[in-house]
Amino acid sequence: MVCIPLVGSSREEIMREAAGIPSIAPDIIELRVDAWEFIEDTAASIAMTREVREAAGELPVILTCRGHWEGGLKKVSDEAKFSLYREAAKEALVDFIDVELVYGDEKIREVLAMIAGSEIHLIVSFHDFEKTPPKEVVFSTLAAQIRAGAHVAKLAAMPRCEE
C-alpha cells in the first residue's frame, strides 16, 4: 500500500502537492494538517480540506494533525485540532481520522462519537522515533489502541538494529 503525505504549509503548496497525486498513483493520501500555516483557523482549514477532498477524487484521505511530541511539524492547539476533526466528520470530508493514543480513552471516545453513523474510520496511533520498543510494549500498545476503539491500530517506531 502506498500512502502519500501532503505536507505543504500554504494553500498553494498543498494544492501543488495534490495536483501531483495522479502521477504517483497512491492507494491513500495523508493530509498532514499540522504543517498548515493556517491550522488554528478552523474555517480556513475546512475549506482547504474540502479542496483536497475534491482533488483526491475517490482516493481515501487520512486527516492527521500529529502532535509535536510524536513527530508533528509544529505545535497545534487541541481546540483547533479537534474542531477541525469535528467539522470534517460532519461533512464527511475524509475517510480516516488519526488520533494519538496518548490522548486517552475519553478524547478517543469523543472522536468516535464525532464519526458515529458515518463511514469514517478511526486510526489510533503511537510513534516512537527514538527506538523500537520491546516486543511486549509493542503488543500492549496495540492492545490498548484496540481497547480504546481503534478501527486501525498504528504503531510507528525507529529501528536501531536488525533484531
Language-model segments: which ranges?
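Generic structural signal for well-ordered alpha-helices
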Residues: M15-A19, T42, I46-R53, Y85, ...
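Glycine/small-residue-rich loop that forms an oxyanion/phosphate-binding "nest" at active or ligand-binding sites
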Residues: V61-V99, Y103
